[in-house]
């Protein structure tokens, strides 16, 4: 049955093809309120795009527990073999705008929102286990360097490599980005990582450090530079279409979800800083433990409502899962929610896709587009049967000491990148060097190239020498 056309107020709409005019050839009448409403709404259809991760796609699905983890965390989402929790995901680029080609070389966002019985739990990571910077103070500058030149409004290799060459902590992530995995062939065919270290707490108060890994069950597949360039010209939404079409035809992508668990004290005494997001925890020391499967089996029914209005935050934690001292994570706990307040409004949590599946009871009221919490009391303490605190949900703090100040982090930013380079096959190393040449070779200032080659050399001398040769630098100048 065809629905009746109406205005936004529900009134029947007689003619949506012709404006009201003074005669057949006369001017449009200001009394045509339906025309005015249509134009006014059109002017307000767009919302600010995400300041990062603007281009992306998503899908709905579920997480199924395959190993009960209640010995390590009291979070209900990870307890009980066979338990299913609905979720929604979003995969994205980092730097490109909303219309940017999907096959541009970039880190990919990998975000998951679990609708648990204890509220929403978000894992907001990437398709790489590390990141470019480890201090939130540097994050805005990093993003500025990856976006458009304020004068030319063009992407700038000089800006990107200038920042990287002056930020030694970035060399590990840059190596991953310039490797084969810098251009995934499909969102379905890439791994995901929580990136940061988090804390798990069990019902007895025992604490563990945890890192999340999402291992694609479709296998890792990447694009060559040539094919990526070809697809960018033919289908700018290639990865988005690939994900949608696969799910639409019943080819549901899935990931094996695993964790690295580190006993609390062991983490504090680990040879490297496990709270530095530019580094990984060796799987030889702490092997992966499979905990479940993530399956995506439903496409968005309305992309704007399901994906554009979708909001993630690392601060969306549930009892049994807590933040760690990771500096970049600490900054993200604020930054993401503040970004959504700007992009979607003060009450973005009330949008259907962000609304938890459990009732919400608190003392926050009003604001733009608010659906208030009935007639309940709006202050605390009170004696009016308002919602009460839940002591069992308290966090388990860490013992902290030290002098306040601005501190640099671990100076060893090179060994991990060197190990990664040496783990690559000869063919993978050759493609890595060629990918760097294609990008670093476009830099117009030799001093930037020299600084970056020095970074690669400190990671591995052969690595540095090969990059220097590829961009035609005399190694003596390095």
Swiss-Prot record:
It comes from Latilactobacillus sakei. Residues 1-23 are annotated as: Disordered. GO terms for cellular component: cytoplasm. CDD domains: catalase_clade_3. Decomposes hydrogen peroxide into water and oxygen; serves to protect cells from the toxic effects of hydrogen peroxide. Signal peptide: none annotated. PROSITE patterns: CATALASE_1, CATALASE_2, CATALASE_3. GO terms for biological process: hydrogen peroxide catabolic process; response to hydrogen peroxide. The active site is at residues 53, 126. Its EC number is 1.11.1.6. It is an enzyme of class 1 (oxidoreductase). This is Catalase. It is found in: Cytoplasm. Keywords: Cytoplasm, Heme, Hydrogen peroxide, Iron, Metal-binding, Oxidoreductase, Peroxidase. It comes from the Bacteria. Heme binds at residue 336. Its main location: cytoplasm. Its cofactor is heme. It catalyses: 2 H2O2 = O2 + 2 H2O. It holds the Pfam family Catalase. Belongs to the catalase family. GO terms for molecular function: catalase activity; heme binding; metal ion binding.
């Amino acid at each position: 049955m065809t629905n009746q056309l109406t205005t936004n107020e529900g009134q029947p709409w007689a003619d949506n093809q012709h404006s009201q005019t003074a005669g057949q050839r006369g001017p449009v009448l200001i009394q045509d309120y339906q025309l005015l409403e249509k134009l006014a709404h059109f002017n307000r259809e767009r919302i600010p795009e995400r300041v990062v991760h603007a281009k992306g796609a998503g899908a709905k699905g579920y997480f199924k527990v395959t190993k009960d983890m209640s010995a390590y965390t009291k979070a209900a989402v990870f307890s009980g073999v066979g338990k299913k929790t609905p979720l929604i995901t979003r995969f994205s680029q980092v730097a490109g705008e909303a219309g940017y080609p999907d096959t541009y070389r970039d880190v990919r966002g990998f975000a998951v929102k679990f609708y648990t019985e204890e509220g929403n739990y978000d894992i907001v990571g990437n398709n790489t286990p590390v990141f470019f910077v480890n201090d939130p103070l540097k994050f805005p500058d990093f993003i500025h360097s990856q976006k458009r030149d304020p004068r030319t409004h063009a992407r700038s290799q000089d800006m990107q490599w200038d920042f990287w060459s002056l930020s030694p902590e970035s060399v590990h992530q840059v190596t991953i980005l310039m490797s084969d995995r810098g251009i995934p062939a499909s969102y379905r065919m890439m791994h995901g990582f929580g990136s940061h270290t988090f804390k798990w707490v069990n019902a007895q108060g025992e604490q563990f450090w945890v890192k999340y890994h999402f291992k694609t069950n479709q296998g890792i597949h990447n694009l060559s530079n040539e094919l990526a360039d070809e697809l960018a010209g033919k289908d700018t939404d290639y990865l988005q279409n690939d994900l949608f079409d696969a799910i639409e035809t019943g080819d549901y992508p899935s990931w094996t979800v695993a964790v690295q668990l580190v006993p609390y004290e062991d983490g504090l005494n680990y040879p490297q800083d496990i709270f530095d997001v530019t580094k990984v925890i060796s799987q030889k020391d702490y092997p992966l433990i499979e905990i479940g499967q993530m399956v995506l089996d439903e496409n968005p029914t309305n992309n704007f409502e399901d994906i554009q209005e979708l909001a993630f935050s690392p601060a969306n934690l549930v009892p049994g899962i807590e933040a760690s001292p990771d500096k970049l994570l600490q900054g993200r706990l604020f930054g993401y929610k503040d970004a959504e307040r700007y992009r979607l409004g003060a009450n973005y949590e009330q949008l259907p896709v962000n609304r938890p599946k459990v009732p919400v009871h608190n003392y926050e009221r009003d604001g733009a587009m608010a659906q208030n919490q009935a007639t309940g009391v709006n202050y605390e303490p009170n004696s009016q049967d308002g919602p009460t605190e839940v002591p069992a949900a308290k966090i388990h703090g860490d013992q902290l000491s030290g002098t306040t100040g601005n501190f640099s982090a671990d100076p060893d930013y090179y060994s991990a990148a060197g190990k990664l380079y040496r783990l690559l096959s000869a063919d993978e190393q050759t493609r890595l060097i060629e990918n760097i040449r294609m990008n670093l070779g476009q830099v117009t200032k030799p001093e930037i190239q020299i600084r970056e080659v020095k970074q690669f050399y400190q990671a591995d001398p052969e690595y540095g020498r090969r990059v220097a040769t590829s961009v035609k630098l005399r190694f003596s100048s390095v």
